[in-house]
């Protein structure tokens, strides 16, 4: 990566904890391996429930933004599906490594968007990510991707294959619990995905997108579009 690209990446990163009352502004969506501006920006405040103050501003996506993310996921699917299970495991495990490097940031992000005490966010909510990811990796290691149909058909095999692009919509509460339970098994299975987190608690999901990027998840394999049900959720569900 060139110095110019490194500088741009740093500018796009969300910083936690905030300095005083510093406002977080993150209008971009993570599509095809990059943070891209919405096609039709529509600001949405993120409220800290503990103070009822606006702590961040994001943009609500449109049908066109959703279509762009789905197109990126469709284009990335053949190569990701053809990646060996061992290689997929290695790449996805990198998300866990990124979490440990930045887990305090994740705790502050969740505390801010949820209004949760920082100790609860740090010890319970943020820890959903490594807990679930580790258990998915353990289960993954016991999957037989190609196995015999049975004694009655010794020459016939069952092959497990990824199904395609997965649309994922998560609620506001316990955000990393919901995101990890949906995204990680999809990636391990060889599916590509588009995530729409709740517009009420999107900060931790955007930080999760940074983890995916820095872990080396290939462009288009994981995509994130913020938005409401009418603009993004319905469109994502229609694909």
PLM segments and residue spans:
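N-terminal alpha-helical segment of soluble enzymes
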Residues: 47-114
